[in-house]
């Protein structure tokens, strides 16, 4: 493959994901969370079927673009999980999306070293089909069911995920909280300083009647949603600009220089193991330490690692194996916080009326930034080398630490109405 074809193979998936994002937004609110997740598994099935029957580089690249359309469904997965999870464990469960991604990477790297090309393709095709079948066994999100006026089905969904009786008090309280989230007067009440707790009227189902408003119109009128979207997009943008994509692309030549005695496939497997350990640890810590300070600490640590790696590449002040330590250190801290937390906050910041839209806008930002990073920065590497590029990534990390310190709210264990109140209070402080 030529250098252009290799570049397209890596970046075209981001374009496919970006193009499919509007469709994901529409389907989340029309088809539902569960069936959207199933539908976005189909591009992977078609991708592997195409690759099974062709050896053409052009067709394989096109198939990867098709698989990228399936990647747009990551927003649907995050929204789905956040809506079926209880507030106390929402962060851990939502971050499991990233843990699953890295587990898949580890398995793919492992199979790549021991299976033939055809066997790898068939395994991935089988898993893609299995994913669709297994998701089909789950219940729809209770929030979406309530939005659709299916209260009895929502109660059954809650009972299924909480493992309790449909008539239990826990289900009754959970339904009341969902009604509160869907109350069109919620933000007005919060703006007026009223207690966002569940009122007797809401428990009795006497919330104001919903008016038909488009997602874009709701977002335009919702100050808390606009502020949450701004914060989520900035956090997502700076985490991509921390350079993990470039690190993954150039990991092999860096490892060859740092540890020439180790095969590149072994280095990739170890890297995937580091990814998984960090993301699983994030699942434990994100609901204990909280999003804000875990994000600040890990961003700072990852920035230090990437800065030291840049100086090592430029000045060679330590043995070559130190580069490998910095690479693993950066990847560990990045996947402990900056990798999963943006997807967690994108799934929990927003009211149900705009959750699908805003989550997809945040994900679209990620696809755009990934594409820019892979295309523009690859040119910059040829002109300036890797070391100055890593200084840019370190600067992005420094920006992220400062931004999260002042603007990222702590949402650990908070309900969606309490999160809206945080953004409203922040806006009031800015207005003073």
Label the model's feature ranges.
Residues 1-161, 187-432:
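Alpha-helical transmembrane bundle of multi-pass membrane proteins
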Residues 168-183:
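Short, well-structured alpha-helical segments
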